[in-house]
């Protein structure tokens, strides 16, 4: 296993932005993480047939969609039902929780308070996501939200921290 550059981690999927493999980083104990295991992305709703085949050939066999029911209804995943890819939808932005967003979170000048609130108010959903990861140790897993930033970024940061990535790599990837 070897270190991959940022360019080597980027998957070439024209209809999506922010699609990258989380593998190929050196961990704190000197090992390198495996590529073709976890891929973070934006919503794969507009994939062409060739792009679906590219992701399939890349090894994607599980998709964890972190979007709300409304977002999924507006633009369903093109990978849902494609070949033998398993699809899971775990809504990480429960609308019932957003209605009670504490004022201290609303008043933050950055998103850090929102991320903490998201973690605290969606513990069961985060558990479900990591349970899916645990159940598929040999499959490549793609996880996404709409833009591939906030919800996807939190999951990616947690995975990277669990795997022992250097903090600067976690921040840089985020």
Features from the language model and the residues they span:
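Cys-dependent protein tyrosine phosphatase-like superfamily
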Residues: 1-142, 154-174
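Ser/Thr-glycine-rich phosphate-binding loops at phosphate-binding pockets of nucleotides
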Residues: 147, 151-152
